[in-house]
């Protein structure tokens, strides 16, 4: 294994079929970089600006988001079975066409909340008649 160091330079790299395990990038700009067929299991990112990042066909099992701003983010065709969201600001969050079996908010089953909402709505309609 050869070790190299690059300091204070602007360069473009085309790295293919390589093992860069254990590499360390500090104060580096990877703007517009492209990663294809990359294994980053166990990698960590601290103080990262990932605005505009697109992740497609990825396995994020066991991933942790901590102190992350996901405002204006879009999640499509996502499997979040067994995931947890804690201490989060979900103001204005929209969930559409989602399977919610067993989903809870503060310990209350969401399907029960929706059922109760529908029942109250019907009751309110009958009261006005």
Where are the model-predicted features located?
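Charge-dense polyanion-binding interfaces
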Residues: 129
